[in-house]
UniProtKB/Swiss-Prot annotation:
InterPro entries: Glutathione-S-Trfase_C-like (IPR010987), Glutathione-S-Trfase_C_sf (IPR036282), Glutathione_S-Trfase (IPR040079), Glutathione_S-Trfase_N (IPR004045), GST_C (IPR004046), GST_C_Theta (IPR040077), GST_N_Theta (IPR040075), GST_Theta (IPR051369). Homohexamer. This is Dichloromethane dehalogenase. It catalyses: dichloromethane + H2O = formaldehyde + 2 chloride + 2 H(+). SUPFAM superfamilies: GST C-terminal domain-like, Thioredoxin-like. GO terms for biological process: glutathione metabolic process. Residues 91-224 form the GST C-terminal domain. Gene3D superfamilies: 1.20.1050.10, Glutaredoxin.
Amino acid sequence: MSTKLRYLHHPASQPCRAVHQFMLENNIEFQEEIVDITTDINEQPEFRERYNPTGQVPILVDGDFTIWESAAIVYYLSEKYDCSSSWWGSTLEERGHIQQYMHWYAYTLRLGGGAFHWTIFAPMIYGYDKDFTVEVTKGRFLLYESFDILEKYWLKDGDYLCGNTLSYPDLATCQDLVSHDAGRIIPTSMWDSHPKVKAWFARMMDREHAKTVSAWQYENVRKYLDDGVKLNFQRKTAVLKGTEVYSGHNNGIIYNGDDDSFVTQHG
């Protein structure tokens, strides 16, 4: 007898939303289990030992097998359920192109998630008396720089990031931008100066399952921005990985005021 998949996640997490959308898009049955990352439950030794030594979500449990890291989970599900080859490419060249995107994305656009995290969640976690200017600046730089590459390279010849067919990079990237859009991190001028990215994001958000998995993020982040309703963070450690600022990394990049541009300070 087969056991239903257990999916441990939280809708505040971009990787969690991307995996969730993939499962919905492919009609994969699963048992949903929300891990309350506003607490420190996923940092407890028992949780780390049983599910993930990093304490991060998403996590997929398939019988006696447990797997974490969003792209790894989606690849596993693609193989297990013989999903369309379009998700990871049907030819050697397509697969290489998609892997190229995922590697680029991991150290650029994904790290740009710091723009959202340090603007919206970090003050709730660490206190509003803390100054996160450096962290926000790094995140915005990576985010805005990524917009240029999305526009000029990844969306240059197709409706989707890796061609004219929907693939997993579209889901991962869309859910990253959901956080920035919900948090009003991306100015109107940035969307307007990147029409291909703007049209692609609108096309992605027209998908039923994209709306479903992102509803929590929009609702709760906008409640905070518009009405001052904060999430009750009891933890005092980072919620999302990939947002830490390391000494010397992108050192010298500074935000240049309200025109949403960046300059590099030398010397």
